[in-house]
């Protein structure tokens, strides 16, 4: 009787493992700006964000929206296309974007606005460098930036 029970459990586990997973490959052919993805984050609205060597990409489950460096200084945008890291702020509706040599960007995804933080040699409170490689949320609602 014990052998039958063990056999039944084994068969049940095999059947439960046979459930198919749906995997979707996303790349430049689907609208991603570059296949070299350096960071991925999910915001509070459920959107996926991809940091690449050629811009910031927002995926809504169907299509990509790409945010590139804005050369027109009268409009808002990210300060560089070569990105290092992403962090969805645990408190606010802000996506933090670390760039290579172009500072730290804060994207408010509710109001669709960007803020930029750069190194300023005249301001000791500014970033120590414009190359932001990692952003981590601290327990006290501050950010650790390297």
How does the language model describe each region?
Residues 1-146:
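Carboxylate-rich, polar loop motifs that coordinate divalent cations or form catalytic acidic clusters
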